[in-house]
Amino acid sequence: MRKKIIATVIGTSALAAVTWTNADAATTYKVKSGDSLWSIANKYNMSVAKLKSLNNLTSNVIFPNQSLKVSGSTSSSTSSNTSTGSTYTVKSGDTLSGIAAKYGTTYQKIMSLNGLSNFNIYPGQKLKVSGAASSSSSNTSGNTSSGSTTTYTVKSGDSLSAIAAKYGTTYQKIMSLNGLTNFNIYPGQKLKVSGKASTGGSGSSSTGSAGYKTPVFNHSNLYDWGQCTWHVFNKRAQIGKGISTYWWNANNWDTAAAADGYTIDRKATVGSILQSDMGYYGHVAFVESVNANGSITISEMNYSASPGIVTYRTIPASQVSSYVYIH
């Protein structure tokens, strides 16, 4: 009997040792599609604030396959949050508008300083936040000027708002110059960036939204990664019409936007936000084009595909007015 008791004690001690080792080893978590900081924090019985502190996160944006510390001491911020003089080292979750707000500048200025042609940045990247603009010799090869008209050849990763910022104009002006009715551009495409507008505006009237009230926010994207709200926030930032990051679930967006001073109606325009109260959380999408037959084309996430995947859908003319639009 005595021997059995001793064996039981030893076995229990060994089990405890094994359990401790496994708990100590489980200090990181690999993000899966659909995860959010809240769900991960809840899984490990910690607060979102603690999880963000452990990983030096400045926003709620996370990415699939990203490794997050879920236990241990807070990461030293000296290596990842470096800001020496006029340069800044990008951290996970950063956006150009967020960095610009931190340094009292604009995202267009940062793009110009670093020769950026799109909004894509990555952790560890060093960005100039003050000083002289980067040499644009590498970009001039795609630009031609003939008389009073200047053209630009689109490169991979370009957006209309980025091109507009580069030439000190607006994306609406470029759309008008080239007779564009949506934001879709492709590498190799030649765009007029100055001169006279193209004739035959067969559908460009959809961009005529001068009467709309459209405040602009320079917030970081705090919406859950891959959701419809996350996608629309990014799309609006890309066209220079940033929205608030505090509108919460999609079914609250029309009320929150109206409170912030945006025009809300049932008329779709290119670049407006389609909003619906369908489902438990509601849904939002980005209006890519208003078509000649009265239908509209929208882009969205987490509607007919998994979170993080952009899909496109055409809303028939007969259904367009059944949705609310934020301008």
Swiss-Prot record:
Occurrences of domain LysM (ranges): 27-70, 86-129, 150-193
Known EC number: 3.5.1.28
Molecular functions per Gene Ontology: lytic endotransglycosylase activity; N-acetylmuramoyl-L-alanine amidase activity
Protein name: N-acetylmuramoyl-L-alanine amidase sle1
Catalytic activity: Hydrolyzes the link between N-acetylmuramoyl residues and L-amino acid residues in certain cell-wall glycopeptides
PANTHER family for this protein: LYSM DOMAIN-CONTAINING GPI-ANCHORED PROTEIN 2, MEMBRANE-BOUND LYTIC MUREIN TRANSGLYCOSYLASE D
GO cellular component: cell surface; extracellular region
Every Peptidase C51 domain range: 203-327
UniProt KW keywords: Antimicrobial, Bacteriolytic enzyme, Cell cycle, Cell division, Cell wall biogenesis/degradation, Hydrolase, Repeat, Secreted, Septation, Signal, Virulence
SUPFAM superfamilies registered for this protein in UniProt: Cysteine proteinases (SSF54001), LysM domain (SSF54106)
Location in the cell: Secreted; Cell surface
GO biological process: cell wall organization; defense response to bacterium; division septum assembly; killing of cells of another organism
Signal peptide: 1-25
